[in-house]
Amino acid sequence: TGKDGVVLATGGFGANAKMVQEYNTTGKWPDLSKTGTTNRFSASQGDGITMAKDAGASLTDMEQLQLLYLGNLVDGQISKFPARDVNGTDQIIFINKEGKRFVREDGRRDQICGGVLNQTDKMFYILESGDGAGYKDIKDPAWRSGDGFTFEYLEKNGFIVYADTLEELAKKLDMDPATLQATVDEFNKSVESGNDEFGRTLYSTKLEKGPWVATPRQACVHHTMGGVTIDPEARVLNEKGEVIKGLYAAGEVVGGIHGANRLGGNAVVDTVVFGKLSADTLLADTK
């Protein structure tokens, strides 16, 4: 019934395009009103933040928005792709529609997304070869993507482009084969020398043999670092810094936990720690 208190754990607002654009004020990102999201559309609408604000809660870091470059081109979800299941980050490169690299693949999320948004049609391909000890044959009938899809489904629906040779792949992607080959050759030189034109430092193998897989991706709104302000015990605070009695919060609905650029995986710790802490505090406050 909430008579003793309420814990807000309603998530962020990454799937609410209007709200995202309202707080997109730092100049870091272009207009995001039509940008996809990796969040489920029925969730991450910012409802909890809005309700808390109506109850007098202070908001923190609402302008801090994180994008992720792994959204598929259909609905923006981090799904339906073999990348990193076939090979790790150290064995892939990112290419634009012209067949050229444009960013360090082991860079920060915001830097990669900024690069993606400057490319033709604001998209790119994750390029993988048949090299590397971790390579998996995605045409094997037993193979499935991380979310359970077969090679046939992914290829038929355009989630991946597959070819036995790099030249064949370039033609399927409507790229100049010579340009794509030159891009791969230059990267392979970087693997040998350890000096990359974009500053990449993570390598493990050259890209030399087929089959080749290109996975089209886009930068999408992923995490919203802003939300309600809490004290160290997860009590929600008002604009004067005073505790709003009986109101607690945990997870992405809270602002000020991750700063301007959340590190991947840190939100898991955030939800676990403050989820327990908010419940413990509520119980302690009602004794």
Annotated model-derived regions:
Residues 30-37, 76-81, 149-155, 259-266:
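Short beta-alpha connecting loops at secondary-structure transitions
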Residues 1-71, 274-277:
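Glycine-rich loop(s) and the adjacent beta-strand/alpha-helix scaffold that form part
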Residues 49-51, 55-175:
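An anion/pyrophosphate-binding glycine-rich loop and adjacent beta-alpha core
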Residues 133-142, 153, 226-287:
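C-terminal structured subdomain/cap of oxidoreductase catalytic cores
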Residues 179-261:
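A glycine-rich dinucleotide-binding beta-alpha-beta segment and adjacent secondary-structure elements
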Residues 67-72, 109-113, 220-225, 253-268:
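Glycine-rich phosphate/pyrophosphate-binding beta-alpha loops
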Residues 39-40, 81-86, 117, 217-221, ...:
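Short Gly/Pro-enriched turn/cap motifs at secondary-structure boundaries
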